[in-house]
Amino acid sequence: MPGWSCLVTGAGGFLGQRIVRMLVQEEELQEIRALFRTFGRKHEEELSKLQTKAKVRVLKGDILDAQCLKRACQGMSAVIHTAAAIDPLGAASRQTILDVNLKGTQLLLDACVEASVPTFIYSSSVLVAGPNSYKEIILNAHEEEHRESTWPNPYPYSKRMAEKAVLATNGRLLKNGGTLHTCALRLPFIYGEECQVTSTTVKTALKNNSIIKKNATFSIANPVYVGNAAWAHILAARSLQDPKKSPSIQGQFYYISDNTPHQSYDDLNYTLSKEWGLCLDSGWSLPLSLLYWLAFLLETVSFLLRPVYNYRPPFNRLLITVLNSVFTISYKKAQRDLGYQPLVSWEEAKQKTSEWIGTLVKQHRETLHKKSQ
């Protein structure tokens, strides 16, 4: 597929930015369009550096702006759609999450049809498949099981419906008479340098005598390193354009993980940060069943207050379930169809992430030093 081009939505985000950085290394790629709505100054500087390369074009626009999407898609060979409102807690309104994740995806699919873009890769989530209960044990989930989330919460619901829309659009006729081919990648928790969840966890711990609060003691999960998650998207874009590989990939979804050890989220946080003196809270924790029912009570209070006050609980049943479930996935189908193998080993991913956490610790200490002067 010589001379191909690619649009990446959500290019200012954690995953999207890494995909753009890796696409720059693709020798046969003629043009990369990086579409974003908002991002921090650091991300802006990095994308600006990438823009100095002839094949990177940075675009600012909204995933809900149909005309913007049509312009962004014009002349592209492929679209990698990572833009999303990632909000399991429901901090944003239900309508906002549905608009960004579902309506935005539908608008982008329509833009691909109008602009005759033949390849569409969707960044989905394992939450479209579960876990539905913290009592359920799921080990090495695979695509043939056809698991489906039953949560009504806007984030898993919107991602599930958006994935269905993407896969259902496979085979749709393009304006130029061609055919749109789609696939979806279901991603678990993504960690690595610049991960906002990890950053918040570390900064909170540093304000608490370097003690990491335990929130996910009972979980067993297999998170994926951001570099490997990005690599899977590039392989999917390549494979879906390959006449030999494409027929078996069209309309399919794939679980993506790597060789990160299966462990609790608490243990992952500790493993990545222990070099810098952070440790897990050794105090007593509430029983999981009690936490779950407390979350139910808080959700009930939020619902009853809704007509007069917008109360957002600090946690909900979905979050308690996700953070405390035994839910692991297998990426064998991605290995078979996409030729996916993790680029970055666990040891290297751990080292890179730990070094980045070290910069957060250093910044915190410098801030404390300035305040004490």
Curated annotation (Swiss-Prot):
Modification N6-acetyllysine, positions: 350
Species this chain originates from: Mus musculus (Mouse)
GO MF term (any one): 3-beta-hydroxysteroid 3-dehydrogenase (NADP+) activity
A cellular component annotation (GO) from this entry: mitochondrion
Similarity comment: Belongs to the 3-beta-HSD family.
Keywords: Acetylation, Endoplasmic reticulum, Lipid metabolism, Membrane, Mitochondrion, NADP, Oxidoreductase, Steroid metabolism, Transmembrane, Transmembrane helix
Membrane topology: Single-pass membrane protein
Gene that encodes it: Hsd3b5
Transmembrane segments: 288-308
Active-site residue list: 159
Protein name per its UniProtKB record: NADPH-dependent 3-keto-steroid reductase Hsd3b5
One Pfam family in the UniProt entry: 3Beta_HSD
Pathway membership: Steroid metabolism
